[in-house]
Amino acid sequence: MKKRKRKSKTVQADTPDGQRAGEAIIEAVENQITDSNPPETRETLERLMAMGESRENAMRYIASVLSIEIFEAMKNKTPYDKERYLLNLANLPDLPYE
């Protein structure tokens, strides 16, 4: 069985589906940063990097927070909670589920 080449060194999932999902989340974070929507995403990236995190790790932190928001919205069938997302970004590197 061939090992699948990973497209992103930021995402290192164990399964192809997990890899695709992780890459989609990273792409969403990249879009938020590029579009400055919300601007707090870029600010969080810059803050984490200023604290000594690599860009990859900072992106992983932000992606974790976005993943939680997506999961909560799907699980509870509720809209995206921007206030909670921004609060969780502000609290990084402390993760919401720790």
Q: Which role does the model predict for each range below?
A:
Residues 1-98:
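Structure-specific DNA junction-binding interface
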